UniProtKB/Swiss-Prot annotation:
GO terms for molecular function: aminoacyl-tRNA deacylase activity; ATP binding; isoleucine-tRNA ligase activity; tRNA binding. Its main location: cytoplasm. This is Isoleucine--tRNA ligase. It holds the Pfam family Anticodon_1. L-isoleucyl-5'-AMP binds at residue 621. ATP binds at residue 665. HAMAP family: Ile_tRNA_synth_type1. It comes from Mesorhizobium japonicum (strain LMG 29417 / CECT 9101 / MAFF 303099). IleRS has two distinct active sites: one for aminoacylation and one for editing. The misactivated valine is translocated from the active site to the editing site, which sterically excludes the correctly activated isoleucine. The single editing site contains two valyl binding pockets, one specific for each substrate (Val-AMP or Val-tRNA(Ile)). Keywords: Aminoacyl-tRNA synthetase, ATP-binding, Cytoplasm, Ligase, Nucleotide-binding, Protein biosynthesis. The lineage of its organism: Bacteria, Pseudomonadati, Pseudomonadota, Alphaproteobacteria, Hyphomicrobiales. The gene is ileS. Catalyzes the attachment of isoleucine to tRNA(Ile). As IleRS can inadvertently accommodate and process structurally similar amino acids such as valine, to avoid such errors it has two additional distinct tRNA(Ile)-dependent editing activities. One activity is designated as 'pretransfer' editing and involves the hydrolysis of activated Val-AMP. The other activity is designated 'posttransfer' editing and involves deacylation of mischarged Val-tRNA(Ile). A motif ('HIGH' region) lies at residues 64-74. It comes from the Bacteria. Belongs to the class-I aminoacyl-tRNA synthetase family. IleS type 1 subfamily.
Length: 993
């Protein structure tokens, strides 16, 4: 018999993990295979079939621009969206995702123009619809490329039927939305200062602006007081001025009001000087001067008192304060333009107007007001316009700068009449022109320059060309923000109410967009470009829009069949006007702001597609979209439907490098998602996304990626071990009440985690989920439960209830963890699921497991918190003993545990603590703890001394490697314990030995 025993390979009698699921992931090779599998089976269609009849959940995709390969920001955005749609699908919803693309606009025009220049072609000589056709083909190419890149990230959506803003149906619906604004009277042609890109020759919306450091010329200029207001105006009627006020103002008649500006080129557009009733002003006399130009001794100047000293220093003069000048006196002054008489112009009076935007923080306390070159200037001018007109002052705002940045004839002395030609503000390359210097030279010539300097400050630039923009008065098409819409509301009030009714994640987004809506001007819709949806209206010479529903329908029908190219085709005007007199109506050839395009996507997707619904449950984009897509969608929908097109808005931050710097090619610190995918796999990138506080700016680089790779390996190895263990799963179940406490504790933890997972997905708090699951898998499973149960799982008999219960729990653990993680790591979880269920279609067609209510057991959990406290002291002592080489494996130890805490002792009374500590035996002692015993400060009343099992006469079992007192009791298997001998007999009876 002994000979027989010696021939047994005990390792073959163990239920060791068996799996082909590799430790090395090989994601770059495996993921494309799974992408193709999902595409071949049309997984998205199967998801829709499986969810038929469920409540719809719609995340509406904010359209990326169809230009170039995706970058890391795209990857972050699409992964977050995919996690949301997948998680809601697996939580029992019909969670749809239709990807979309923004196709119109300047960047694509630029690309085509670059191609033209390379071929020696002139865009202006190309028929507009031929140019538009090339733009369309360019966008279509990049939609295909980006669609493939998004799917390689693991994104599941209806990529066979995406939406695009250049689809004929979309162009028809966008035009239809514009026509709704026109019919309701919200659309108007106006003249306002807009941000204008000279380089791009178009007006820009706030969303198309970024701020960069810029060095500007600064000047202090003198405006001479010409006279006093002859008559005041009260309720539109002339009224006598206070004689005393006039008398007190007489000594101001030979004074100058000094202004300060960072845009000298706007002086020809000056029409007023603004002051503040809240600022203290004084009349000052120059007593000494050092400059070759500027004020001379004896001159009288008016400043804000708080800024007189600073102004004095700038001009290198000495000032003496004569007396206070009241706001009432300032309002009584009429100034002359410093360029009066130049080129026969500037003969108009320059009034003083009160303005809320005036402060004494910088400058002189007076603001040079050029209503054609600034929003605040425009507002101050328009507020004062009724009073000014009653005084006989012309309030028409001139067009002093043209679309190329040149001065016009409305700027005498600087326009085409100037020797050498019109001065220019900015050239075609975005560089400063000669306008500032021309203005400064003329001020010096007229002794109107007080001082000059330079200032580095934040200045608006086009986000596309990266070149500075100017504020320029132009005729444009606008949507009113504050016009009564017939029900007592305005577009602004509707939008503000909609913001209050919307859930924002994070909550700070609500205040951010609210502040923008509260302060924003009317919405400028027009762009002077070719590639886009036209402002498809007809207007008379006064700017009145033709309101004819039959005409509008013809336009929309044509766009539906032919696209918006129909507007630019020969004969379009007569075709659409029908019986209207074409000579009375002008066809508007401007195109729409692309933000109106994307702001209308909810119309031709959510409303028009039967697989979607309006409003969307959620919009998710970067935080810059508070002034972009969230903003334009809100305004468009509130203007036509009275509410927002979304219920929830989720925002994410931007991706920085590991040092918190903005990524840029010039710094060489960019992370290219395609490179990460090729080297490590998309699931690594996805793991990074879901473990970040994504609503803030995130950091990414080599070290961050390596941290995620390490975490992924731990997670993967835990899944691999479960798969190996489940190779021995025969599907048997053990009733909950018959399970050991440790198994019931694990089921309780699954019940707790189920709440964390569901609440986390509902709140879009993915980091909360991943932290909980990874900690659970690494700390509670690998280092606790699995470690403890390896003996029972590997060594116990097939009939062992403990082993059966443990296999059953591992089965539940696998099902829950794989499904919970599937939305975040779809490739790895699909691989794991198909390894366990080779005949399955996809884990993504399943739902999260329903956790039985009786798995929750708080009393048991509380007891085991105490058990684990004791265990922690024991394992701490074992680590010390192992480090001191007293023992090798913990199975060589017999800890002697002295307990002087009644609650802890009661908790472990019926627990096999040797099994919990993975030792061969464990002795509970009472009384005084031995000197030198191991303790932990945070676990009072527990002390441990580690003894060796061999010293207690225990013998090592050749099968389980545990040290016991009953090794050799069974003569059939003399080198194993009684437990292991009984198992071997059972295996032999089953024919497995």
């Amino acid at each position: 018999m002994t000979d027989t025993v010696e021939t047994i390979d005990y390792s073959k009698t163990l239920y060791l993990p068996q799996t082909d699921f590799p430790m090395r992931a090989g994601l770059p090779e495996k993921e494309p295979v799974l992408v193709k599998r999902w595409q071949d089976m049309d997984l998205y269609a199967k998801l829709r079939e499986s969810a038929a009849g469920r409540t719809k959940y719609v995340l509406h995709d904010g359209p990326p621009y169809a230009n170039g390969n995706i970058h890391i920001g795209h990857a972050l955005n699409k992964i977050l969206k995919d996690v949301i749609t997948r998680s809601f699908q697996m939580r029992g919803y019909d969670s749809t995702y239709v990807p979309g693309w923004d196709c119109h606009g300047l960047p694509i025009e630029w690309k085509i123009e670059e191609q033209y220049r390379a071929k020696g072609k002139n865009k202006d000589e190309v028929p507009v619809n031929e140019f538009r056709k090339e733009c369309r083909e360019f966008a279509a190419h990049w939609i295909t490329v980006q669609g493939g890149e998004f799917q390689r990230l693991g994104v599941i959506g209806d990529f066979k039927n995406p939406y695009t803003t250049m689809a004929f149906h979309a162009e028809s619906r966008i035009a239809g939305e514009l026509l709704k604004f026109a019919l309701s009277g919200q659309l108007y042609r106006g003249s306002k200062p807009v941000m204008w890109s000279v380089v791009e020759r178009t007006a820009l919306a706030e969303a198309e602006i970024e701020y960069q450091d810029y060095e500007s010329d600064t000047i202090w200029a003198k405006f001479p007081v010409a006279n006093l207001v002859v008559a005041n105006v009260v309720d539109g009627q002339p009224a006598e001025l206070n004689p005393d006020l006039s008398d007190r103002s007489l000594d101001l008649l030979d004074a100058h009001v000094v202004i300060w500006t960072t845009t000298p080129w706007t002086i020809p557009g000056n029409r007023a000087v603004s002051y503040s009733p809240r600022v203290a002003y004084g009349l000052y006399e120059v007593t000494a001067a050092e400059n070759a130009f500027g004020p001379e001794p004896g001159e009288k100047l008016i400043f804000a008192d708080a800024l007189a000293a600073e102004s004095q220093a700038k001009a290198k003069i000495t000032l003496k304060r004569l007396h206070h000048v009241s706001a009432e006196q300032l309002g009584n002054l009429v100034l002359s333009h410093p360029f009066k008489g130049l080129g026969g112009g500037y003969e108009f009076p320059v009034p003083m107007v009160a303005g809320d935007h005036v402060t004494d923080d910088a400058g002189t306390g007076f603001v040079h007001t050029a209503p054609g070159h600034g929003r605040e200037d425009f507002d101050a001018w328009m507020d004062a316009a009724p009073q000014l007109r009653a005084r006989g002052i012309d309030t028409v705002i001139p067009f002093t700068v043209d679309d190329a940045g040149f001065f016009t004839r409305d700027a005498p002395g600087f326009g085409p009449d100037r020797e050498g030609g019109a001065a220019r503000v900015i050239d075609d390359n975005g560089k400063k022109g000669n306008a500032n210097q021309a203005v400064i030279d003329e001020l010096i010539k007229r002794n109107a320059l007080f001082a000059r300097g330079r200032l580095k400050h934040s200045y608006p630039h086009s986000w596309r060309s990266k070149k500075p923009v100017i504020f320029r008065n132009t005729p444009q098409w606008f949507v009113y923000m504050d016009k009564d819409l017939g029900d007592g509301t305005t577009l602004r009030s509707r939008a503000l109410k909609a913001i209050d009714d919307t859930r924002f994640v994070p909550a700070a987004g609500q205040n951010r967009i609210r502040a923008m809506i509260e302060e924003r001007p009317d919405w400028v819709l027009s762009r002077q470009r070719a590639w886009g949806v036209p402002i498809a209206v007809f207007a008379d010479e006064d700017g009145n829009v033709l309101k004819d529903e039959a005409v509008n329908q013809r336009i929309m029908d044509a766009f539906e069949e032919e696209g918006a190219d129909a507007w630019f085709a020969a004969g379009a005007k007569e075709r659409f006007l029908g019986n209207h007199d074409a000579s009375k109506w002008k066809q508007v050839m401007d195109i729409l702001d692309v933000w109106f395009d994307s702001g209308s996507t909810h119309v031709f997707t959510l409303e028009d597609r039967p697989d979607l619904k309006w409003p969307a449950d959620v919009y998710l984009e970067g935080s810059d979209q508070h002034r972009g897509w969230f903003h334009s969608s809100l305004l468009e929908s509130c203007g036509t439907r009275g509410r927002a097109p979304y219920d929830t808005v989720v925002t994410h931050g931007f991706t920085m490098d590991e040092d918190g710097r903005k990524m840029s090619k010039s710094l060489g610190n960019t992370v290219v998602p395609q490179d990460v995918i090729k080297q490590s796999g998309a699931d690594i990138l996805r793991l990074w996304v879901v473990t970040t506080d994504y609503w803030e700016d995130q950091r990414l680089g080599k070290n961050v990626l390596q941290t995620n790779i390490d975490a992924y390996r731990k997670l993967r190895n835990t899944i691999r071990w479960m798969l190996g263990t489940l190779a021995h799963d025969d599907g048997e179940t053990v009733p909950l009440e018959a399970m050991p406490e440790l198994e019931r504790l694990m089921l309780h933890r699954l019940a707790e985690l189920d709440e964390v997972v569901r609440q986390g997905y509902d709140a879009f708090e993915f980091k909360r989920i991943t932290r909980a699951l990874v900690d659970f898998m690494v700390v509670e499973l690998s280092a606790f439960y699995f470690d403890i149960r390896k003996d029972a799982l590997y060594c116990d008999a097939p009939s062992s209830v403990k082993r059966k219960a443990s296999v059953q729990v591992v089965r539940h653990l696998f099902d829950c963890l794989v499904k919970w993680l599937a939305p975040m790591l779809p490739f790895t979880m699909e691989e794991a699921w198909l390894d366990r269920h080779p005949d399955a279609v996809s884990v993504h067609l399943d739902q999260f497991p329903e956790i039985p209510a009786d798995w929750k057991n708080e009393a048991l959990a509380e007891k085991w918190r105490k058990v684990r406290q004791v265990r922690r002291v024991v394992t701490g002592a074992l680590e010390i003993a192992r480090a001191q080489k007293v023992i090798g494996s913990s199975l060589e130890a017999v800890p002697v545990v002295t307990i002087n805490d009644a609650a802890l002792e009661a908790a472990i009374a019926d627990v096999d603590m040797a099994e919990m500590a993975i030792t061969s035996d464990l002795v509970i002692a009472h009384g005084q703890a031995p000197e030198g015993a191991f303790t932990l400060d945070d676990v009072r009343g527990v002390a441990v001394v580690v003894e060796k099992a061999e010293d207690r006469g225990l013998v090592k079992c050749a099968r389980s490697w545990r040290y016991t007192a009953d090794v050799g009791q069974d003569p059939a298997f003399p080198d194993v314990s009684a437990r292991d001998a009984a198992v071997l007999h059972e295996l032999k009876a089953l024919g497995r030995l």
